[in-house]
Every structure is written in C-alpha cells, then in structure tokens.
C-alpha cells in the first residue's frame, strides 16, 4: 500500500495528508471498513466494475460506488489505475486458489480432488466476473513484470492439477500418464470449454461443461487394468 516516504517534500506531504483525510472521511455517515474487510470489499467491487465497464473505461469512482467507500479509500488500496488490473487479478486468483485448496484438503480421494479442480477452474456461467477479469487482463499490454505475474498465476493452476495427478498415480487410482503432456492437454481443453461457457454456446444449455471435462480427464487417467 502506498505510504509517504520519510524524505518526501512539502508538496508530497500535503498530498499524503489530503489522501489520508479522504480515506478517513465517512461516506454517507456509514462506518468505513478497515483492514482485510476493506481490501476484500474493494477487490470484489473492482472485479464487478471491470466486468461491467471494461478495463479501459472503469474509474476509481465506479469501484468506490460499488464498494460503498470513498474514492480516497479505493486509492489507498490501489494507488494508480495502471496497477489495478494485475492487483485485482492476483487477489482474485489467490482467493479462488485458497478456497480450492481448502476444499481439496477435505476431499477423500484424488478423484474427488480432480472434480473440484474442474469445478473451480471453469467459469460458473456466461459472463462469470472472475473469468471476465482474466480476459480483460490478458487483452492488455504488459511489461516483463506483468507477464511474469500472469505466468505465475497460470502456473499455479497447473501445479494444483499436477499435485492431484501425482497423488492419484501414487495410490494406483490414476494411470501413469506423462505429466507435462497431460497437463498441457487438460489445460488446453479447459480453456477452450471456458470460452464456450463465457460466450454462452447453446451446446451447453442442456449439458454440463464440467461433466464433459471431468469425463474426458477421467478417461485419460483411468488405469489400463480397469474397464
């Protein structure tokens, strides 16, 4: 979070005080949230605003209105707008990844974990806000640091899938597939299905993309000595 440096000049200190006053100012006399609660609310509001208006058109005031906060409070969390997309995506993915891991830790078998992976990876419905955020971010130009963040986020999901398959192979529940190639095929299929779901392809009106993906993965992972 941006804070004034000790050697900041009078102008910077004045700006910092103004920002601090904006953060502390009540909005419609309602209590301003603080800490993790405030950051979570700001992030969720940003996801919705970006999905609705697009990355290029969204304003900090749009996010503030959705979050029920002052614009100064939003600026406190994001600083400049050019940091917005990657910060929000990183937060969204960390939140989704943590919820997946909690569910996976409670699952009894690798097969259950595989089903959870598919459910958490695919968008829930056409226009899913979290997946829309992915597409908005990918459409933007990025420097090397930004591309590394996106690579790390993608790699994290591949590593989750690898962990499930490794566990299933160790217990004899999954076939001994060549892991790098399997992950590439699995992720490519899931990404293609995600596009279908987001677009609202009619083929999925009476069928489940989740069930289709899971059946395909289970078929490839089924040990050869099982029917």
Indicate where each model-derived feature is located.
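Hydrophobic alpha-helical connector segments
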Residues: 87, 100-131, 182-186, 210, ...
């Amino acid at each position: 979070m941006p804070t004034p440096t000790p050697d900041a000049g009078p102008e910077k200190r004045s700006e910092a005080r103004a920002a601090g006053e904006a953060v502390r100012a009540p909005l419609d006399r309602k209590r301003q949230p603080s800490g993790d609660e405030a950051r979570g609310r700001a992030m969720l509001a940003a996801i919705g605003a970006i999905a609705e208006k697009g990355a290029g058109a969204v304003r900090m005031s749009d996010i503030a209105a959705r979050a029920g906060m002052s614009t100064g409070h939003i600026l406190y969390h994001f600083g400049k707008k050019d940091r917005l997309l990657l910060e929000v995506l990183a937060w969204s993915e960390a939140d989704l990844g943590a919820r997946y891991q909690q569910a996976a830790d409670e699952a009894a078998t690798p097969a259950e974990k595989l089903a959870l992976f598919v459910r958490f990876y695919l968008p829930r419905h056409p226009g899913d806000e979290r997946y829309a955020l992915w597409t908005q971010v990918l459409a933007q130009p990025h420097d090397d640091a930004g591309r590394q963040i996106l690579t790390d986020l993608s790699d994290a999901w591949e590593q989750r899938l690898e962990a499930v398959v490794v566990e299933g192979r160790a217990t004899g529940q999954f076939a001994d597939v060549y892991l790098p190639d399997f992950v590439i095929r699995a992720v490519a299929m899931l990404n293609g299905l995600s596009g279908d779901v987001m677009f609202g392809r009619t083929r999925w009106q009476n069928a489940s993309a989740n069930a289709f993906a899971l059946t395909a993965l289970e078929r490839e992972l089924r040990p050869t000595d099982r029917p």
